[in-house]
Swiss-Prot record:
Enzyme class per UniProt: translocase
Key word DNA repair present: no
Name under which the protein is recorded: ATP synthase subunit beta, chloroplastic
Top-level taxonomic group: Eukaryota
Binding, ATP: G163, G164, A165, G166, V167, G168, K169, T170
Record NCBIfam families: atpD
Gene: atpB
Species the sequence originates in: Stigeoclonium helveticum
Family assignment from sequence similarity: Belongs to the ATPase alpha/beta chains family.
Topological type in the membrane: Peripheral membrane protein
Residues annotated as transmembrane: none
Gene3D superfamilies: 2.40.10.170, Bovine Mitochondrial F1-atpase, Atp Synthase Beta Chain, Chain D, domain 3, P-loop containing nucleotide triphosphate hydrolases
Amino acid sequence: MNIYTETNKNTGRLIQIIGPVVDIAFPAGNVPNIYNAVVISGKNTAGEDMCVTCEVQQLLGDRCVRAVAMNPTEGLMRGMDATDTGTPLMVPVGKTTLGRIFNVLGEPVDNLGPVETEQKLPIHRSAPAFTDLDTRLAIFETGIKVVDLLAPYRRGGKIGLFGGAGVGKTVLIMELINNIAKAHGGVSVFAGVGERTREGNDLYMEMKESGVINESNLSESKVALVYGQMNEPPGARMRVGLTALTMAEYFRDINKQDVLLFIDNIFRFVQAGSEVSALLGRMPSAVGYQPTLATEMGGLQERITSTKDGSITSIQAVYVPADDLTDPAPATTFAHLDATTVLSRGLAAKGIYPAVDPLDSTSTMLQPWIVGDEHYACAQKVKETLQRYKELQDIIAILGLDELSEEDRLLVARARKIERFLSQPFFVAEVFTGSPGKYVALAETIRGFKMVFAGELDSLPEQAFYLVGSIDEVIAKAAALTSK
């Protein structure tokens, strides 16, 4: 791995400023490489010192380069000094990044002082070689029943997380961070790409409350945060995902850990690339997107993978513009996803959390030759039962349960129990639910649903299935309810 070292630097002059894009002239023969970081420094129009880091994107002739700024360019003046660092953007990596918040440049922005690390890595790196990849199809157990049973995640895979505001995306993300730390000894990296600053602040506060970030002992924290919010220049929003990915790669390759990488929101990564592409004068492609859309997306996604040392499993929130799944941005994202987790407002309104829609969520891993016949048959039976219940709901609403056949009444009763049994108390939500969190192993989940279908639990009240972990807790809760 290339650890950052100082190199001989050459200096140029700022000759043109076009919003967040700048042109810089260097001495002939000393033009920086594409993707090199260039630092512009000097006095701004108000006479104050300013420093702007840019990334070289184009070579204009034998002396000039066009670069994209990672900081606001207000106050820059022509003639300012621009120093080539000789390397791409370098960001800190390692255990000292846990519990901290960084910007795209790897600078801490949480007012907790500098990060004590000598190790820095460039954000532009090649994807792992084919010979280093781990091609085994292994399930990544999350301890969340509805995910593990119906739409299992692939170890080293990519998962799309779909859901509107207020349906529990943040809580689900925090539970996954908590579970990977406890069950897999892994760490997480969260990339806030082009989302609201308020949401980033809320997430940080909630992580501190739930113990995912340990403020008194940062080394015990389970996550590093990298933010490039929507008020920042497009260059920062375009590169913040790569900064977070570089930190995650270090944990995978050097610490040999399983890493969870969250990207919220992958659409904003594409959107920022579109803005930069237009500023660089490239001809737009379909719907005004950049002509390099597939290449840019592939460059990020291909680095998210399992190697023989460890894995990076990525969960990406996907915004679908105007609910149009054929839009080039979500359509390009879908090509890379192994699973989709869809959060339903209807389930959240019923108080069933996590509000994962069991019928809309999908996974390429749910195949009998990957998960085994028992798991596959159980998952299909759950989906069939819930689908039939959904079809019967109109009849129930108009005519009532009494008009159904005996067989359908039994199916509805089991479907309602299944719906509630797919809910689960979370560790990070203990303060809200008052119930201790539960991690449920996949084998235990399958055993529970098989008992439901075998009719062993038909006599139990459906409220016994709500917000519990394993099936044994259902039986204990039912006994407690009847004794009352």
